[in-house]
Amino acid sequence: MAGGGRIPLWIVATVAGTGVLVVVGLFFYGAYAGLGSSL
C-alpha cells in the first residue's frame, strides 16, 4: 500500500476531523443561538 496514494492518510484524517468538529460546533452554536433568541 506504500506509494499508492498521493495524499498522506494523516492529512486526510486531520482535515476530516477538523471538518467534523467545525460542523458539530456550528450546529451546537446555531442551536444555542436559536434557543437564546427564542427566549
UniProtKB/Swiss-Prot annotation:
Short name of any one Pfam family annotated for the protein: PsbJ
Subcellular location: Cellular thylakoid membrane
One GO-annotated biological process of the protein: photosynthesis
Entry-linked SUPFAM superfamilies: Photosystem II reaction center protein J, PsbJ
Keyword Membrane appears in the UniProt entry: yes
Membrane-spanning intervals of the chain: 7-27
Keywords assigned by UniProt, alphabetized: Membrane, Photosynthesis, Photosystem II, Reaction center, Thylakoid, Transmembrane, Transmembrane helix
Main function: One of the components of the core complex of photosystem II (PSII). PSII is a light-driven water:plastoquinone oxidoreductase that uses light energy to abstract electrons from H(2)O, generating O(2) and a proton gradient subsequently used for ATP formation. It consists of a core antenna complex that captures photons, and an electron transfer chain that converts photonic excitation into a charge separation.
Family according to the record: Belongs to the PsbJ family.
Protein name: Photosystem II reaction center protein J
Lineage summary: Bacteria, Bacillati, Cyanobacteriota, Cyanophyceae, Synechococcales
Gene name in the database record: psbJ
